[in-house]
Regions:
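Structured, active/binding-site neighborhoods that engage oxygen-rich ligands
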Residues: 1-314
Length: 314
């Protein structure tokens, strides 16, 4: 299996997970700049996702499907790609699935108006910026993470998993230990409608980390393959708790299993990054990442404009 970061000409190329994370962050930054209320914050993230999919599918007239919802000229303004910025960010890296279908539907889905499908981890792998934007209020991080995930995924365990992950990261930013952040977030999940299935899967990952076998990959296979959002987050919990601040070992366990390894590693890395900080991350990984400057700039900007509350939409 992998032992070191794979690079191309010294650059560790990102996947669609990072693409969508960047567009999530950009939507939140627009919302912050406009001082949006809660509902319009979700809409700014939705608009950002539409810009993302339009950049990947230039032959599809994505924006015409939303003419009754958003001004076309606003959707067409994509600062991430203006004047040749961030080359490679518009490279299609995934087959589509639930996320593509929802974004091409002409609708804005929500928890109360759910998409027809969507159990997979397209929710968790893109949602970390929500946690930074809402780190001052972990409950708000949960709610906004959930609702931004429901833009594309209609299955409760999928959008709730994004909420749980955002709450964990928000707690970590505030100085909680990993186990404390996870357990408190699981307690919160128990109060949420339709959270029972997700809770059981996440609890399995946590419990396995406390009584691990000699081979992490065996434990990971017991949890699942990570394609589903609930299994994805459960494996990430297991790796974070089993390896603690040993970031490299945790990420190696994520990327060397036979399932959706890049997305599991993305979610695990998001949580560990919040836990150990930049100084605790292996320098050989950090320095080689594609779009590193953009990612750092977005994270710093989100932190600077972070909110403790968002007014309800009128």
């Amino acid at each position: 299996g992998l032992r070191e970061m794979e690079t191309c000409n010294g650059v560790a190329m990102v996947t669609d997970d990072t693409q969508m994370t960047i567009y999530t962050a950009q939507g939140l930054l627009y919302a912050g700049k406009k001082h949006c209320d809660y509902g319009n914050t979700v809409r700014e993230v939705h608009k950002s996702y539409l810009r993302w999919i339009a950049s990947l599918l230039p032959t599809e007239d994505v924006f015409s499907r939303y003419e009754s919802m958003y001004p076309r000229e606003e959707l067409e303004r994509n600062e991430l790609l203006e004047n040749g910025a961030n080359p490679g960010l518009d490279k299609k890296m995934c087959r589509g699935g639930s996320t593509f279908r929802a974004l091409l539907s002409g609708q804005l889905y929500s928890v109360s108006n759910p998409a027809d499908e969507g159990v997979r981890c397209g929710t968790t792998m893109r949602s970390a910026p929500v946690a930074i934007y809402c780190y001052k209020n972990p409950s708000l991080a949960f709610r906004l993470g959930r609702d931004c995930a429901a833009i594309t995924h209609g299955y409760a365990s999928a959008y709730l998993a994004a909420g749980v992950m955002c709450m964990v990261i928000a707690r970590l930013i505030n100085g909680s230990e990993m186990e404390e952040a996870i357990e408190e977030s699981l307690d919160y999940l128990k109060t949420q409608k339709d959270g029972e299935e997700l809770y059981a899967v996440l609890r399995k990952g946590v419990d396995l980390s406390r009584h691990p076998s000699e081979k992490p990959l065996n434990d990971i296979q017991t949890i699942g393959l990570g394609w589903r959002a609930d299994e994805n987050l459960a494996i990430a919990f297991y790796c974070c708790l089993r390896f603690g601040r040993d970031v490299k070992s945790a990420l190696l366990a994520c990327v060397n299993h036979s399932g959706d390894s890049d997305s599991v590693a993305a979610v695990c890395g998001n949580m560990l990054g919040a836990y150990v900080g930049e100084e605790g991350l292996p320098s050989e990984i950090v320095e080689s990442i594609q779009f590193k400057e953009l990612l750092c700039q977005q994270a710093n900007s989100l932190f600077s404009c972070a909110v403790s509350s968002l007014p309800s939409s009128s």
